[in-house]
């Protein structure tokens, strides 16, 4: 396969075929750098050498009634994680201050559970208004399944983006959870779009899905027109049904990132949870396909030290995309 020719076709507006998508996932290791060169050509066209940085605030941990097999916060998990109800506004603001001082442009407020209560929405709305006035950061919320009126309140408060992952393909979804459907997740993404927020939706790779499932995920997100696509790589946690699952290697993870770039050329693609344990020493190469990362810790697992991420970006010669609103103090 001529990967640069394929990249040029994508830049000319063509969609890759299923055979070409499968060829990306089956790319011989000795062609991997050529594949990434093609992905980088696409990435650079739309994003240059800039990298978007995101930080997570785990605003509510554990206590979730859902039965997602990958998640340490689910009702069926026995993982020893911190559990607490929604934090107060001041705690959310403290996290935003840390993000601003670290030059992290997007602050992500995440809460466990099937969906937020109106009281939890009240806390987030109050915090977001002050974050916007004080720091001018972009704010992403991830609170579960939303009612239309809740989505409108978040939009009016200043939430820029709302995350609700599809996680896997529609066909594989029943193998991951039975407490909600794939269509439930899609409806929430549509609710977000209807409210005027930017839709963020992504996947988790390494949950015993097939390569055809991975291709279906990338195409589904294209059809949903998700502006931001977090690509997680399973960090199997003891005490979850997927405990001990180890299907991934760093080279395959890079091929997955390339696939998402070839299929979703104009979108923000973020290397998300599991980056450190799955890409390992090949983490820097991932940014030739992706243009965004999380900095700091994830929900219940530790991330790489911030200074190591900033050093990685400096070594790559990439620039941090940090442009808070001009009215921030």
Curated annotation (Swiss-Prot):
Reactions it catalyzes: (4R,5S)-dethiobiotin + (sulfur carrier)-SH + 2 reduced [2Fe-2S]-[ferredoxin] + 2 S-adenosyl-L-methionine = (sulfur carrier)-H + biotin + 2 5'-deoxyadenosine + 2 L-methionine + 2 oxidized [2Fe-2S]-[ferredoxin]
Record-listed [2Fe-2S] cluster binding positions: 108, 140, 200, 270
Domain Radical SAM core, residue spans: 46-275
UniProt EC number: 2.8.1.6
Cofactor: how bound: Binds 1 [4Fe-4S] cluster. The cluster is coordinated with 3 cysteines and an exchangeable S-adenosyl-L-methionine. Binds 1 [2Fe-2S] cluster. The cluster is coordinated with 3 cysteines and 1 arginine.
UniProt-annotated binding residues for [4Fe-4S] cluster: 64, 68, 71
Pathway(s) the chain acts in: Cofactor biosynthesis; biotin biosynthesis; biotin from 7,8-diaminononanoate: step 2/2
GO MF terms held by the record: 2 iron, 2 sulfur cluster binding; 4 iron, 4 sulfur cluster binding; biotin synthase activity; iron ion binding
UniProt-listed SMART domains: BATS, Elp3
Pfam family, one: BATS
Swiss-Prot/TrEMBL cofactor(s): [4Fe-4S] cluster; [2Fe-2S] cluster
Assembly notes: Homodimer.
Homology family: Belongs to the radical SAM superfamily. Biotin synthase family.
Protein name according to UniProt: Biotin synthase
Organism: Anoxybacillus flavithermus (strain DSM 21510 / WK1)
Lineage summary: Bacteria, Bacillati, Bacillota, Bacilli, Bacillales
Gene name of this polypeptide: bioB
């Amino acid at each position: 396969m001529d990967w640069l020719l394929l990249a040029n076709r994508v830049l000319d507006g063509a969609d890759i075929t299923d055979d070409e998508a499968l060829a990306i996932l089956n790319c011989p290791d000795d062609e991997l750098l050529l594949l990434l060169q093609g992905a980088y050509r696409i990435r650079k066209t739309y994003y240059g050498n800039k990298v978007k940085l995101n930080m997570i605030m785990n605003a509510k941990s554990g206590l979730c009634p859902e039965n997602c097999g990958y998640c340490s916060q689910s009702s069926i998990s026995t993982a020893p994680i911190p559990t607490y109800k929604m934090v107060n506004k001041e705690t959310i603001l403290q996290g935003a201050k840390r993000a601003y001082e670290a030059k992290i442009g997007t602050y992500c407020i995440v809460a466990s559970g099937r969906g937020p209560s109106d009281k939890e929405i009240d806390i987030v709305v109050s915090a977001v208004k002050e974050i916007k006035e004080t720091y001018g950061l972009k704010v992403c919320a991830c609170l579960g399944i939303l009612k239309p009126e809740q989505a409108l309140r978040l939009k009016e408060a200043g939430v820029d983006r709302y995350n609700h992952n599809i996680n896997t393909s529609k066909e594989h979804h029943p193998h991951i959870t039975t407490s909600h459907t794939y269509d439930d997740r899609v409806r929430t993404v549509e609710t977000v779009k209807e409210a005027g927020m930017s839709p963020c939706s992504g996947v988790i790779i390494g949950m015993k899905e097939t390569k055809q499932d991975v291709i279906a995920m990338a195409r589904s997100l294209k059809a949903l027109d998700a502006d931001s696509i977090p690509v997680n790589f399973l960090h199997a946690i003891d005490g979850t049904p997927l405990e001990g699952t180890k299907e991934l290697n760093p080279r395959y993870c890079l091929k997955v990132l390339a696939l998402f770039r070839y299929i979703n050329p104009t979108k923000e693609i973020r290397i998300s949870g599991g980056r450190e344990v799955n890409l390992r020493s090949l983490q820097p190469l991932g940014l030739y396909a992706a243009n965004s990362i999380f900095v700091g810790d994830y929900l219940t697992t530790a991330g790489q030290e911030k200074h190591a991420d900033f050093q990685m970006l400096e070594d790559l010669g990439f620039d941090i995309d940090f442009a808070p609103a001009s009215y921030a103090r």
